[in-house]
Amino acid sequence: MKKEEKIFKAETKELLNLMIHSIYTNKEIFLRELISNANDAIDKLKFQSLTDTDILKDNDKFRIDISVDKDNRTLTISDNGIGMTYEEVDDNIGTIAKSGSKLFKEQLEEAKKGDIDIIGQFGVGFYSGFIVADKITLETKSPYSENGVKWISSGDGNYEIEEIAKQDRGTKITLHLKDGDEYNEFLEDWKIKDLVKKYSNYIRYEIYFGDEVINSTKPIWKKDKKELKDDDYNEFYKATFHDWNDPLLHINLKVQGNIEYNALLFIPKKLPFDYYTKNFKRGLQLYTKNVFIMEKCEDLIPEYFNFISGLVDCDSLSLNISREILQQNAELQVISKNLEKKITSELEKILKNDREKYVEFWKEFGRSIKAGVQDMFGMNKEKLQDLLIFVSSHDDKYTTLKEYVDRMGDNKEILYVPAESVDAAKYLPKMEKLKEQGREVLILTDKIDEFTLMAMRDYSGKEFKSINSSDFKFSDDKEKEEEVKKIADENKELIEKAKEFLKDKVSEVELSNNIGNSASSLLAKGGLSLEMEKTLSEMTNNNDMPKAEKVLAINPEHVLFNRLKSSVNTEDFNKLVDVLYNQALLLEGFNIENPAEFIKNLNSLIK
């Protein structure tokens, strides 16, 4: 029988070195590669049998076998697939198909940069065995050959290839494991079972470890939806994504067309425990041909849906050299966009049909949606704006922006007020007057709410307006405005003196009839609101953080204004201004600078 000793071509040597030292940073995925090759070999045999019915003979129960021999430190993977002839082994294993071509050399150079699909294009996953083995023995037989073939190499530049007597069709690969504790675990039963479950659990063919089948041949996402109950989804979710709770929602997608894929997505009930830590990573599990490729594929899901768990299985996706990072290709982008639309659509359905369930979702994950609206200066506004909900003064319940607009009648602006709580907002002086007018206000209790609305600018052509802004008006009563302006002109000295006392604490002092029944109110002028200032100051202790341009508004109809007028030339004037200013600070949730001074002034004025 034929026997030869050969030398790897230069490119193959280089690839071997690249595979061992550069491409696979995760040692354990060698088993995934070899099982995937075995799966492909059976696929090829089944395809061939469609036109050559005699090829299977009496060996038509397809299977993959794994065994270990601790004494000899070997791990063996075998299949009863198509096998290879002597020439095929020499071409596909010894020299690698196309290895002498200009294309391969170019791709090899690109592989060093980590961005090319060598495995997918040239089938070199076999060489990943050298990550854990210092010698590999391959025995194979094609149904079209009388003899089998043995191939042996230590990965040192040479290989032996010879014909052998072999009866059974298929391929057996024996890895002679390297010495060292880090390789010993690959001889343990539990480790092999764990790796198969992790990477190859849904291979189409049964994987045997001894007499035990250790994989599930048909994944849940490829089963008929009619076969599945909520319990099936719930148990799969909890076992796969390590959650104690059932998911809030599952989405099972089977897409056919130019790009075919299956997707199974889950919205959890609770935020992941590490959600706000640097360890948290978004992404979906990725399978290709039922082979696990990646734990967290970020490209499949946008940042604002980062809380979603799940997986995608697509046979046609192009993979990079290590099968760990996907190339940025058109297929992936299409799948990602489709998933984004489907998730949005499902959330909108819940919002419409089960408000209580949506509110439960919103309290956990609403911040991610709001952050998505803010991202890129509101670029995602159109996609996400109809998922937003806020508590409304209309009925103290959550409302959508569309529902608000449908109720606003002839009003031109969507009113909102930032507040520590719904109760705190309800008792603000301005809110009482707006309630009397029958005008609805969105109550923003999350510190990022106002940033979200500012990023949006408007909804359905209606601009957002804070009732704490200096240009907010209860009405367009020109006569009333002129009356207030006249009072201000008459008390110009009072206003200037108050501003002089407060110095740079406020940018100006004004009289206003738009602050309800309160004696005074702190308003914001310009783009930065009072609530934004508080939020930014809590994020950092930096004194250089931007401040809101504050306006102290005084109610000319309040009794304290009359007292202020009568004391303009007395020592009580500054005390009254101090009380009005600090009172306004407290109403807006700010800390007053000197509580003792405030109490002292307040007590001295109570006569």
Curated annotation (Swiss-Prot):
Annotated segments matching region A: 1-323
Organism lineage string: Bacteria, Fusobacteriati, Fusobacteriota, Fusobacteriia, Fusobacteriales
Name the record gives this protein: Chaperone protein HtpG
Region of interest: C: 535-607
Gene3D superfamilies for this protein: 3.30.230.80, 3.40.50.11260, Heat shock protein 90, C-terminal domain (1.20.120.790), Histidine kinase-like ATPase, C-terminal domain (3.30.565.10)
Pfam families tied to this protein: HATPase_c_3 (PF13589), HSP90 (PF00183)
Keyword ATP-binding: yes
Annotated family: Belongs to the heat shock protein 90 family.
Origin: domain of life: Bacteria
Subunit composition and interactions: Homodimer.
GO biological-process terms attached to the record: DNA damage response; protein folding; response to heat
One term under GO cellular component: cytosol
Source organism of the structure: Fusobacterium nucleatum subsp. nucleatum (strain ATCC 25586 / DSM 15643 / BCRC 10681 / CIP 101130 / JCM 8532 / KCTC 2640 / LMG 13131 / VPI 4355)
An MF annotation (GO) of this entry: unfolded protein binding
Main location: cytoplasm
Keywords, sorted A to Z: ATP-binding, Chaperone, Cytoplasm, Nucleotide-binding, Stress response
Protein purpose: Molecular chaperone. Has ATPase activity.
B: annotated span: 324-534
Location relative to the cell: Cytoplasm
